[in-house]
From Swiss-Prot:
Superkingdom to which the source organism belongs: Viruses
Protein localization: Host membrane; Virion
Sequence intervals crossing the membrane: 986-1006
Protein name: Uncharacterized protein R472
Record organism: Acanthamoeba polyphaga mimivirus
């Protein structure tokens, strides 16, 4: 007794119902023929028909199976249900109304049925109504889809027809063609239609019955069987192995959450070694076979070839091929194809498609059996390229046809039946035939690498054009090919494309010879399978050998093959399939005879692949075993190279086994050699001490080793052995080499210590040559110091050089000492970049290596001096009050204006978020101001005169004339130290350039709000803060100078003060710079005559006097301390002897030749070693100024020619001679020549000054022109923006984004899933995901709705839930389900005719996958609804007016959004430029980046670089080129909120749409962004490139959106709990730790907030203070979009909230 007996009975009943019942039912025919919408009115007639039909069923066969009355009634009820199903689905098939109409009818029918006497058990209820409505849609969709073309099906929305697609996929193509489609003859033409009976019966019987009642029928039959049969009980044997028993693992986790899942995971882990390895499918093996380098697949296709003169014959119709096949499936598809053709109009598009369809059928059985049609199709191939199987077409005509369709509009394109087919045709050149000429199989390629394929036309027409190279083309992933054979060769390593057609050999017509057991063997066969494997094995695999030179590699040694097969060696052997000749045996039993020819060929290819892999495995083992003399690393390289070369997948375990089993165990062990006795013993060598003899005299140049110079005498000795012929050379090293090696050991440990040691090394050993090289003072060897010297500075006070070396290739934050200051490094780097742009000192702006290195060195110096100076002063035992009093007294610093503060530097200083305490925020602001002071100190030391004169100015206060007018008031009587070794001070006004720099920088810091200004301040520039900065700077300057004088050996102080005082004594006191500034900025002079005198006092210039008339300056004698020699008694008093001061150069100071005396002791007198004069002979009355003057000029003349240029010494006859003037080194010149030299030097100086002024003027003009261009561009953007938005002030962001989305739709499709997320993502429609039922119970499979379905609705201020809600209606259960509109949490539900029900304690949420349009509008926001409750409560303590508080918060939200939009545009531009200029910088030695977001952006960049390697970035590649100039011009525009409709509400959330509406600046920036993106798309003419660019931009939008948005995480319970623990109060955290829920802890905390005042004070203060803090953060964080410190995309500080 079997269940299928009942199945056959039900199947027969349904057939009878269709053929005999419905056709005679008047009610059914009336509903169908009259297109009745309301079929409820036929309810009584339908009930009567079903009842009569069921009663008419013959139950005889059923009673034979079931003799129990109860069971019989149950079976009859089941039959009655499915008769009703069939009846109503038949109505559904013919129903002309909408789905909604059918649903309403079924619901009404079910309600009325409650009072009916006719009963069908379990039918007229909600569940069955849902099934009928579901299958109503499936029937309607099936009727459309099955009659569509493939390309028309691709235009369908997968979400709309998902159920139908699943239904059809479950049936399969063969079933659909054989049963659901049928061919009918209409007007003597074959027409394909839907078979309604089979379709409905498939649903009723196959979907409903088998999934519902069939199990019940089985149980009934099983009960009957059990009553009749007897049973035999058996014992079950259970394994004693605990690891194989899942129940043992279940016991471990008994009582725990997810016990079953955990037990299964542990069970699988324990039994992992017993898992069966995955077996490759036949399809995979076929792909892997043709991907092998040694094999070339042969494909049969035809080529469409363009010819300008080709024209379509409009009169000719399609070739109609009759249906003659015995295969119903093929007949249906063929008839359907012709039917689709006939639907098309007789247009040019139809002619193109009909022609192609006819050619595709060239090898179909219907054509082969009809010679007339063969000749018709052959006409298409009758052209000069017929030997290539090419048909001619006119590409330009086809493009014109497509353009005409496009011009009709988007809707016309979508409704056009052949538009997609045309697009498919013109974008491809090669097309597969639908059938095969002889033998072949179809393969879908899924290899990522392209495959070279040989066309079958080369073989088919080999005798035509045989001297040409073979025709090949490339197959790519996703392509389908008709594989008709395989080819191998040529064997001379030439590419396949270079093989001629005449060199093609049939594998069945050749003999091959190979070596077997050292004997030649010759074979030939008709079995291509066997011959192909023999060639692969003996020609390719057995010839693999190892080559160790010039590099380790594997190659094919074809020498023997070439000798044995001279006729085929350089040729290509092809094998075309023939299943009648190509027989093969399988290792396992497979009945493949019942398979089709295509399946047999696939099995055969899979066998070939297995055999080749087996050959390769054996060959690899043989290579390892025969090369045990190689090293282990070479064997590992061998395995790696072999596997890569032959595409072997060898895992790590298999490699290990290969090495152990076939190498280490086979490797012969070297035997120990034991010497025999009585052999001659060779004595060991004996050490003999060396005699130091034979001195050598060596001449060493102390200045320039390359040129002969007077030398000192050194003696060196060789060491000799007993053998006089063997001399052991000594390798002596200078001490500087060993010291240098020791210094380099510190290089990667402590950079500052390294620099300090290098500085000491330079001082100890270096000597500069005339060629500007650096040599050792001791040995004359060149020292590697140039890169250390070029970054350093010379300290005039200590007469020492101090290096400032910073390694180029290592980021500063990766150096050990600076790893904990990552954020500080980036903020200071951003600050340098920002201030450089503001002040127009562009030597520190840019991305080239030199600029980046210089900026990095500056950052390092700033951090070093901050750390050092703060550390030193924090250890001092002095209070701040005492220190202020001391500074005020000593340096006249106003202690009320001094903000110097000493602190420990750490990254928390830059924490300006509202979560920080008020005290912490205040301290951080003060610390940040102090960092600015250090920045000013280091920054101005990098400026030279020309850079100072070119600094930016403005007409308000930032110019020289305002400085000259008010400078005295700012600087007053402030004093600075003139050196570090004494307490000598000077008024700061003696250094006018320093004062100007301090004034200008303080002005810009205040103007751009980089300097924190507490309190309300509405002025653009407040001079008070300039005075604060200046007084604080003087404190810092003097403090560093004093501490450097005390700690003289500290490298950081030494480097800082050397730069400070070098600038102080040169640039800062240069009045000429002030004069140049006055000339350059004369436009700011408010008086017509200009300002004649400088109000800032300067030190008087030292007057000069001619040599002939010197001035006498009276100077008192000075005391020189002198100490007597003692006989043991210590004298504490010195003898005071007065010595007269020498006021001029006399015979006491200078020799007659003008040089200074070099006095040495000579008995009781002193003697000059240069001129020989004695101290007793000189009187001081002989003036030698003139001699000294010419002596100095003579020294200059030894470096420069008379004309003023440097000498160019060359070797001439053994002497150094200048090639310019002919003079030799150290030559003495006469006075006329020296006077002439001085005149020429003065001329050169004058010329240099003129060039400098000219360059300054040109740069000023360039800067002004650049500013004008920027202003014009901004004006143009604002004008275009206003024009596009019809001069609207607010609410302009939506149309801007819509413009970009429209462009995307053009190239990506309007309603297409972009497939970039786990849930669908569309351009315009949001997606709603529901993964739970109405009461919060999780669903196995989520339900997905699209926005355009209008299933998810929105309602404001719901009357029951008292908030805005989303809701949907579950028609199946008649339940409305409600969600909170802000949090998306499940609130409750309402059943029909019942009260509302709240769902408590649930973690169920509505998920929204926003569209690209919505994400574009939400860029920069954490969430769509912004929670402002905390900010509102905190502000309410000082802002009593509710409206003012609310409006201030919205203002801050807008400001924050403006800053984030700037950073978003930065990210857009930088990402696009990175893709354009992508370079893969990660090598094997570098550590990979583990941060997920960094991996995401790296993958995105790498992905689109590989997809679109070459593309244009706007016109002339200048998209975003001017963004850096525009960036700072977008600022918050004040809004009068009282003039708007915006008012605070009880709901403490602000919709991001409200912020967007009133955010004018962000709208303008988004307009700029969209304009640049569109320009990038338009600058690339190729459509495929535009499509790829659009897809790339979509993914960039997704990436940036995900950086800011937290919607994905905010409703995850674990994240919420973590957030509450981190940010909650102590009471709340304590409750959470004790196991309380989040809701209870929030309620208690809210209660505490209401009863106790909040101790957290607001960080903003007054409204203006918020603006300042906002700008401070913006300026501190803002970076150039190509800055080098933001290489890791995950570190985005824009995510930090900055809102009150």
């Amino acid at each position: 007794m079997y269940v299928n007996q009942i199945d056959d009975i039900i199947d027969g009943i349904l057939n009878k119902l269709y053929f005999e019942g419905l056709s005679n039912d008047e009610s059914f025919n009336s509903i169908v023929n009259s297109n009745k919408i309301n079929f409820v009115e036929y309810r009584e007639q339908i009930n009567k028909f079903i009842d009569d039909f069921v009663k008419s069923i013959d139950l005889t066969e059923i009673r034979k199976i079931i003799n129990n009355k109860d069971n019989l009634n149950r079976i009859i009820d089941i039959i009655k249900r499915y008769v009703a199903y069939y009846y109503f689905l038949s109505i559904a098939y013919n129903y002309t109304g909408s789905l909604k109409d059918f649903r309403n009818n079924m619901i009404q029918y079910s309600k009325l049925q409650e009072s009916s006497t006719f009963i069908i058990r379990n039918f007229f209820d909600t569940e069955n109504n849902y099934q009928l409505i579901k299958y109503f849609k499936i029937i309607k969709d099936t009727s459309k889809i099955l009659l569509m073309t493939d390309l028309q099906r691709k235009t369908l929305n997968p979400l709309d027809v998902k159920d139908t697609i699943d239904f059809l996929n479950g049936l399969g193509k063969e079933y659909i063609n054989n049963y659901l489609l049928m061919i009918t003859v209409v007007d003597n033409e074959d027409t394909v239609n839907i078979n309604p009976h089979n379709l409905i019966k498939t649903i009723v019987f196959g979907e409903l019955y088998k999934n519902q009642e069939r199990n019940l029928v089985f149980e009934i039959l099983n009960e009957i069987e059990e009553d009749k049969e007897e049973y035999t009980y058996i014992d079950i044997v259970v394994s004693s192995d605990e690891t194989n028993d899942l129940n043992n693992f279940r016991q471990i986790f008994l009582g725990e959450d997810d016990a079953e899942a955990r037990a299964r995971d542990l069970f699988e882990l324990a039994n992992e070694t017993n898992r069966v390895t995955t077996i490759e499918t036949v399809e995979t093996k076929n792909n892997d076979l043709i991907a092998l380098k040694i094999i070339t697949p042969i494909v049969d296709d035809f080529l469409r070839y363009h010819r300008d003169t080709e024209r379509l014959d409009a009169e000719s119709g399609p070739v109609n091929i009759p249906i003659v096949s015995n295969n119903n499936s093929k007949n249906v598809q063929l008839a359907l194809l012709y039917q689709q053709r006939k639907k098309k109009e007789n247009t040019r598009a139809q002619l193109v498609i009909n022609k192609l369809d006819a050619i595709l059928d060239y090898y179909s059985p219907n054509v082969k059996n009809n010679p007339e049609f063969i000749s018709e199709i052959k006409k298409y191939f009758q052209n000069p390229l017929s030997y290539r199987k090419a048909v001619l077409h006119n590409y330009l005509d086809e493009v014109n046809v497509i353009d005409k369709i496009r011009k009709q509009g988007k809707k016309a394109m979508e409704n056009n039946e052949y538009f997609l087919e045309l697009m498919q045709i013109i974008t491809h050149a090669y097309f597969n035939f639908k059938d095969f000429k002889n033998f072949g199989t179809s393969i879908n390629l899924f290899n990522t690498k392209p495959v070279n394929m040989l066309r079958y036309s080369n073989i088919e027409f080999q005798n035509q054009m045989s001297n040409l190279e073979v025709d090949v083309h490339t197959g790519i992933e996703g392509q389908s090919v008709n594989l008709v054979g395989l080819a191998i060769g040529p064997f001379n390593d030439e590419p396949v494309s270079c093989t001629k057609k005449s060199d093609l050999l049939d594998i069945r017509k050749i003999q091959i010879t190979y070596m077997k057991n050292d004997q030649p063997v010759t074979r030939s066969t008709d079995n291509g399978y066997k011959a192909f494997l023999k060639i692969i094995k003996h020609f390719y695999i057995n010839t693999l050998e190892i080559r160790e030179e010039p590099e380790f590699s594997i190659y094919n040694n074809f020498d023997d093959i070439r000798k044995l097969n001279p006729d085929i060696f350089g040729k290509m052997i092809y094998w075309t399939y023939n299943t009648e000749l190509d027989t093969f045996e399988m290792d396992t039993y497979e009945n493949i005879k019942s398979n089709s020819v295509q399946d047999i060929i696939r099995f055969m290819n899979a066998m070939i692949y297995d055999k080749i892999m087996d050959f390769l495995d054996k060959k690899l083992v043989l290579l390892i075993e025969t090369h045990t003399n190689l090293s282990l690393s070479k064997i590992e390289s061998l395995i790696q190279i072999f596997s890569n070369m032959n595409q072997l997948s060898i895992d790590q375990e298999e490699r290990r086994d290969l090495v152990i089993s076939n190498f280490l165990q086979k490797k012969s062990q070297e035997t120990t050699i034991v010497p025999k006795k009585n052999l001659e013993i060779i004595p060991l060598p004996e050490y003999q001490p060396l005699n130091l003899k034979k001195p050598f005299v060596i001449g060493i140049s102390m200045i320039n080793p390359l040129n002969p110079q007077p030398y000192i005498k050194l003696e060196a000795y060789s060491r000799t052995t007993k053998d006089r012929g063997i001399i052991q050379a000594t390798h002596g090293k200078c001490k500087h080499e060993s010291e240098w090696n020791e210094i380099n050991k510190v290089k990667n440990q402590n950079l500052n210590k390294y620099n300090s040691l290098v500085t000491a090394f330079i001082e100890k050993y270096h000597l500069e040559t005339t060629q500007l090289d650096y040599v050792c003072k001791v040995c004359g060897q060149i020292l590697p110091l140039k890169r250390y010297v070029q970054d350093g500075s010379f300290n005039n006070n200590t007469q020492q050089f101090v290096t400032a070396y910073v390694p180029i290739d290592i980021p500063l934050e990766e150096i050990k000492e600076y790893r904990k200051y990552v954020l500080a490094i980036r903020y200071i780097d951003a600050l340098i970049n920002r201030v450089s742009l503001i002040t127009n000192t562009n030597m520190l702006v840019g991305t080239n290596t030199n600029v980046r290195q210089r900026r990095k060195g500056l950052v390092k110096n700033i951090i070093d001096i901050i750390l050092k100076h703060n550390s030193v002063n924090m250890r001092k035992n002095i209070s701040d009050v005492e220190r202020s009093e001391y500074l005020a007294k000593k340096y006249n610093i106003n202690k009320d204006l001094n903000e110097v503060y000493f602190f420990e530097l750490d990254d928390s200083i830059f924490n300006f978020t509202p979560t920080a305490s008020n005290t912490e925020i205040t301290l951080n602001k003060l610390k940040f101001n102090n960092i600015l002071l250090y920045f000013i100190l280091i920054f101005i030391t990098e400026l030279n005169g020309p850079q100072i004169t070119m600094m930016a100015t403005d007409k308000i206060a930032g110019n020289i004339y305002v400085f000259l007018k008010y400078g005295q008031k700012l600087f007053g009587d402030l004093l600075i130290k003139t050196n570090i070794n004494s307490n000598e001070t000077a008024p700061i006004t003696q250094y006018p350039v320093l004062c100007y720099l301090l004034y200008l920088l303080s002005y810009y810091l205040v103007k751009y709000k980089l300097w924190y200004q507490p309190g309300e301040n509405t002025k653009v520039y407040n001079p008070y803060y300039s005075k604060v900065i200046i007084n604080s700077f003087v404190d810092l300057f003097n403090g560093i100078s004093s501490d450097a004088g005390r700690i003289t050996d500290d490298y950081v102080y030494k480097l800082t003060v050397s730069k400070m005082y070098t600038q102080l004594n040169t640039t800062y006191r240069n009045n000429e710079i002030i004069n140049i500034l006055r000339r350059n900025q004369s436009k700011y002079d408010t008086r017509s005559s200009g300002i004649d005198t400088t109000q800032v006092t300067t030190e008087n210039e030292i007057p000069t006097y001619p040599i002939a008339n010197p001035i006498n300056i009276p100077v008192k004698p000075r005391a020189i301390p002198d100490f007597k020699k003692s006989s043991g008694i210590i004298f504490d008093r010195e003898d005071k002897i007065l010595y007269p001061i020498q006021l001029t150069n006399t015979d006491i100071t200078n020799c007659p030749i003008g040089s200074y005396h070099a006095w040495v002791s000579d008995g009781h007198d002193i003697r000059c070693t240069i001129c020989g004069e004695k101290g007793s002979e000189v009187t001081g009355s002989v003036i030698r100024l003139d001699a000294n003057y010419y002596y100095s000029l003579n020294n200059i003349a030894n470096r420069r020619c008379i004309r003023g240029t440097l000498h160019d010494f060359i070797d001439k006859n053994g002497k150094l001679v200048c090639s310019i003037c002919g003079h030799t080194p150290n030559e003495t010149y006469d006075k006329p020549d020296l006077d002439k030299l001085m005149d020429n030097i003065n001329k050169i100086d004058d010329q240099n000054a003129e060039n400098l002024l000219r360059n300054i003027h040109n740069q000023q003009i360039k800067y002004e022109n650049q500013q004008k261009v920027v202003e014009d561009f901004i004006r143009e953007i604002k004008t275009d923006y206003a024009k596009d938005s019809n001069n609207k002030l607010y609410g302009r962001l939506g149309p801007i984004c819509d413009k970009l989305i429209t462009i995307f739709e053009t190239y990506l499709g309007s309603n297409v899933n972009l497939d970039i997320d786990k849930y669908p993502v569309y351009l315009r429609n949001n997606i709603y995901i529901i993964d739970h039922s109405y009461n919060g119970t999780p669903l196995d499979k989520p339900v997905i709705f699209s926005q355009n379905e209008n299933r998810i609705l929105f309602r404001e201020n719901h009357q029951f839930f008292k908030t805005d809600v989303y809701y949907y209606t579950d028609n199946r259960l008649q339940i409305d389900v409600f969600y909170h509109a802000v949090t998306l949490k499940l609130l409750g539900y309402k059943e029909k005719h019942k009260e509302y029900t709240r769902v408590a304690k649930t973690n169920s949420y509505l998920k929204i996958n926003y569209s690209i349009m919505e994400r574009l509008l939400m860029l920069g926001y954490k969430t769509k609804y912004i929670d402002i409750e905390d900010n509102f409560v905190r502000n309410s303590s000082r802002i009593k007016d509710v409206n003012t508080n609310y409006f201030q918060i919205i203002d801050n939200l807008i400001k924050d959004h403006i800053n984030k939009i700037k950073k978003i545009i930065d990210k857009f531009s930088s990402t696009i430029y990175k893709i354009k200029n992508y370079q893969n910088q990660l090598n094997e030695e570098q550590e990979p980046i583990y941060l997920q977001s960094s991996q995401d952006i790296d993958k995105l960049i790498s992905k689109y670089f590989n997809i679109i390697k070459i593309f244009n970035i706007g016109e002339d590649d200048k998209a975003f080129d001017n963004w850096n100039y525009l960036r700072t011009n977008f600022e918050y525009q004040e809004i009068n909120w009282l003039d708007t409709n915006v008012r605070p509400s009880e709901n403490m959330y602000v919709n991001s749409e409200l912020v967007n509406y009133y955010d004018i600046s962000s709208s303008e920036m988004m307009y700029y962004l969209v304009d640049q993106l569109i320009s990038i798309i338009d600058s690339n003419p190729e459509k495929i490139t535009r499509s790829n660019l659009c897809q790339m931009m979509v993914e960039i939008i997704m990436y940036i959106y995900n950086i800011y948005n937290i919607d994905e995480y905010k409703n995850i319970l674990e994240f919420k709990r973590f957030d509450y623990i981190i940010n909650g109060s102590s009471v709340m955290v304590d409750m959470l730790r004790r196991g309380q829920g989040l809701e209870q802890s929030k309620e208690l905390e809210q209660h505490l907030d209401d009863t106790e005042p909040d101790i957290m004070q607001d960080m903003d203060g007054e409204p203006q203070e918020a603006d300042e803090l906002e700008d401070l953060k913006e300026e501190a964080e803002s970076l150039d979009i190509e800055g080098d410190y933001f290489a890791e995309e995950d570190e985005d500080y824009a995510q930090e909230d900055f809102i009150e």
